[in-house]
């Protein structure tokens, strides 16, 4: 079975959303993990907007990338530029496929009336990315 790591800055939003969709779309074809180069509490808005789409991430935990240093990953997917630039080299080898896609950080929105809209926009972008990835996955 293949191992996939989704990496972000804080493992609080974008990587959690991607982990949820990848698990759903791959349906047991791979082990999917998410982590952050720093770890923060999972963003409640991420949990809420995923629940709207029928994906429950409320039981996910926020993990630091160092927790996975002994796992050989087949894919490392970075979902923000900061994680891409700071991802430790020991998480990949010559067989690891690295994929980078910088998604907008909805938690950076401070205007409360636009927060849910920003999270939904981010969710839909990540959902499409994960769906497309799952269709090419082998």
Protein language model features and the residues they cover:
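Glycine-rich nucleotide phosphate-binding loop and flanking beta-alpha elements
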Residues: 57, 83-86
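Short glycine-rich anion-binding loops that position phosphate/pyrophosphate groups of nucleotides
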Residues: 12, 81-84
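Glycine-rich, flexible loop/turn motifs
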Residues: 38, 61, 83, 99, ...
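Phosphate-binding/catalytic loops
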Residues: 86-138
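Conserved active-site segments centered on acidic
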Residues: 1-68
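Structural signal for conserved beta-strand scaffold positions within catalytic alpha/beta enzyme cores
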Residues: 34, 78, 99-102
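Residue-level detector of flexible, active-site-proximal loop/helix-junction positions
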Residues: 39-41, 83, 105-107
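Local beta-strand N-terminus motif with an aromatic residue
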Residues: 73-74
């Amino acid at each position: 079975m293949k191992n996939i790591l989704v990496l972000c800055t804080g493992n609080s939003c974008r990587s959690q959303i991607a982990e949820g969709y990848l698990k759903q779309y791959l349906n047991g074809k791979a082990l999917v993990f998410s982590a952050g180069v720093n770890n923060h509490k999972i963003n409640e808005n991420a949990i809420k907007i995923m629940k709207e789409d029928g994906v429950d991430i409320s039981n996910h935990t926020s993990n630091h990338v160092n927790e996975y240093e002994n796992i050989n990953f087949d894919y490392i997917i970075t979902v923000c530029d900061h994680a891409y630039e700071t991802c430790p080299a020991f998480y990949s080898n010559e067989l690891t496929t690295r994929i980078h896609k910088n998604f907008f950080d909805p938690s950076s929105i401070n205007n409360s009336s636009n927060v849910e809209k920003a999270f939904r926009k981010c969710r839909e972008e990540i959902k499409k990315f994960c769906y497309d990835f799952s269709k090419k996955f082998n």
